[in-house]
């Protein structure tokens, strides 16, 4: 741990098209090599695809997807007397959001469609229907926490 003071949280500006801060965080995570305009193009084109498929507001779909992906508990390693236990702990709201965003992006990148916008749109549609790799990741995390419930008294 650093002995200095904690870094200040910077305010994320809302995106230009939808005026949403969470969407900006998503784009920032999607961005590679500082190419924000490329990330924006991918997201907006994916949103257009989602809107044409589901006939719903893409921003609503996006937030519903994140809600379906957000984990409520996770396991953390805790060393007690030479043994390492996987201790289930509740996830803070900021971390929930960050994990959901990260899992959605990783699941999208792992898909087999041709372009990133197709992959992202496909994963968004799957996540809103509670399918897909990102939702599976959350289910696996919850299963791990449930399996290690016996060690929950080691919480810190």
From Swiss-Prot:
Q: Where are the transmembrane segments?
A: none
According to its UniProt entry, the protein's GO biological process terms are: translation
The molecular function terms of the Gene Ontology recorded here are: rRNA binding; structural constituent of ribosome; tRNA binding
**Gene Ontology CC annotations of this record:** small ribosomal subunit
Methyltransferase among the record's keywords? no
List, alphabetically, the InterPro entries matched. Answer: Ribosomal_uS7 (IPR000235), Ribosomal_uS7_bac/org-type (IPR005717), Ribosomal_uS7_CS (IPR020606), Ribosomal_uS7_dom (IPR023798), Ribosomal_uS7_dom_sf (IPR036823)
**Keywords attached to this entry:** Ribonucleoprotein, Ribosomal protein, RNA-binding, rRNA-binding, tRNA-binding
Question: NCBIfam families of this UniProt entry?
Answer: rpsG_bact
Query: What does the similarity note say?
Result: Belongs to the universal ribosomal protein uS7 family.
- Function per UniProt: One of the primary rRNA binding proteins, it binds directly to 16S rRNA where it nucleates assembly of the head domain of the 30S subunit. Is located at the subunit interface close to the decoding center, probably blocks exit of the E-site tRNA.
| Subunit structure and binding partners | Part of the 30S ribosomal subunit. Contacts proteins S9 and S11.
User: Which protein are we looking at?
Assistant: Small ribosomal subunit protein uS7
